[in-house]
């Protein structure tokens, strides 16, 4: 999704759900726990957007929704690692650990695009980001949910202005649109590598 070498992220739709998004993650999670119990996975991580309190969740609600499935299945959240502030680890006496990462930073409301917006590289990419914000603010008609998708519109607009137009986040990261050394992106990358290496 965002180009961390050696890590493959599979959205719910590619796992048999009728779409992506949190509702499909929640529907798939019990089946994934059964696959973990059967030994189908060596490592398992869950990545979701927090979204926003009062709109479609928020960090606290999102973590609670997932823990409402994990904890009754025998998992317990371990203390956070101060060297890797993104993500939580859940242990089980007889199963592999499950790792949970909630965008944008595993503490705040928001989504992947909030992390990306905070990680845009300085220079011409940040100038284009500012211009994208201005364009979105000046739209004569808004057809998207501004409370939920303003950053998504900003990032998609920024990606539409790349060469080639509309590249995905992984290619944009490889092309330097996003600065992987900025704190939120760096913390997320450390978490992915910790979970999957």
Model-assigned labels for residue ranges:
Residues 2-13, 23-197:
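C-terminal accessory helical subdomains adjacent to catalytic cores in phosphodiester-
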């Amino acid at each position: 999704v965002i180009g961390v070498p050696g890590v493959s992220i599979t959205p719910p739709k590619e796992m048999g759900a009728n779409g992506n998004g949190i509702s499909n993650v929640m529907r798939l999670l019990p089946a994934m726990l059964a696959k973990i119990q059967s030994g189908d996975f060596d490592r398992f991580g869950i990545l979701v957007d927090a979204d926003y309190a009062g709109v479609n969740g928020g960090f606290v609600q999102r973590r609670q929704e997932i823990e409402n499935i994990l904890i009754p299945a025998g998992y317990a959240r371990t203390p956070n690692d101060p060297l890797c502030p993104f993500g939580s680890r859940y242990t089980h006496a007889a199963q592999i650990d499950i790792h949970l990462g909630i965008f944008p930073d595993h503490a705040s409301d928001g989504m992947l695009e909030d992390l990306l917006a905070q990680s845009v590289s300085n220079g011409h990419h940040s100038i284009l980001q500012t211009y994208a914000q201005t364009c979105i603010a000046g739209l004569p008609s808004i057809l998207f949910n501004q409370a939920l998708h303003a950053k998504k519109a900003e990032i998609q607009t920024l990606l539409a202005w790349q060469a080639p137009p509309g590249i995905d986040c992984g290619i944009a990261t490889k092309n330097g649109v996003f600065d992987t050394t900025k704190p939120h992106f760096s913390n997320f990358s450390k978490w992915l590598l910790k979970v999957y290496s």
